[in-house]
Amino acid sequence: MLNFVSTPIGNLNDISLRAIDVIRSSDYLYAEDTRNTQKLLNFIKIKKKCKSFHEHNEEKISKQIIQHIKNKKIISVLSDAGTPAISDPGYKLIQKCIHHNIKYTLIPGPSSVISGLLMSGLPTN
């Protein structure tokens, strides 16, 4: 199973209980900046290593992730802040999953796009 896990934008208290459960149950964690993710893991008191997944190793790591999924491992890709695959490498992994008929899910949470829209005062109806 592949999870794309949204993470807090600035305030670590904004992490969802569902996100914590998914992170805790994951066999492997991947993130663009493992230093940011390690701060979050420390905050939620989960002792797991996080592997780097960024534009420079995206092809190699995507193959690893797909192999882990085929081996029935639970994988979570975490954003540095907000929703994965928005301004980070996750979208290419999603394309590969679609191509290989691999199921994936999003653990929703903070989104800078929605926050920006709300703070702009523009009509949303």
What are these regions (language model features)?
Residues K92-N125:
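Class I SAM-dependent methyltransferase SAM-binding "motif I" and its flanking Rossmann-like core
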Residues N71-P89:
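Ordered, amphipathic secondary-structure segments that act as subunit-interaction surfaces
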Residues N57-I66:
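Glycine-rich, highly charged phosphate/nucleotide-binding loops
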Residues T37, P84, S111-I114:
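Short gly/pro/ser/thr-enriched loop/turn and capping motifs at secondary-structure boundaries
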Residues E32, F53, L78-D80, T105-I107:
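Structural motif
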Residues M1-H56:
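Glycine-rich, flexible N-terminal cofactor/catalytic loop recognition
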Residues R18-D21, F43-I46, I66-Q67, P89-I94, ...:
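Short, glycine/charged-enriched secondary-structure capping and boundary segments
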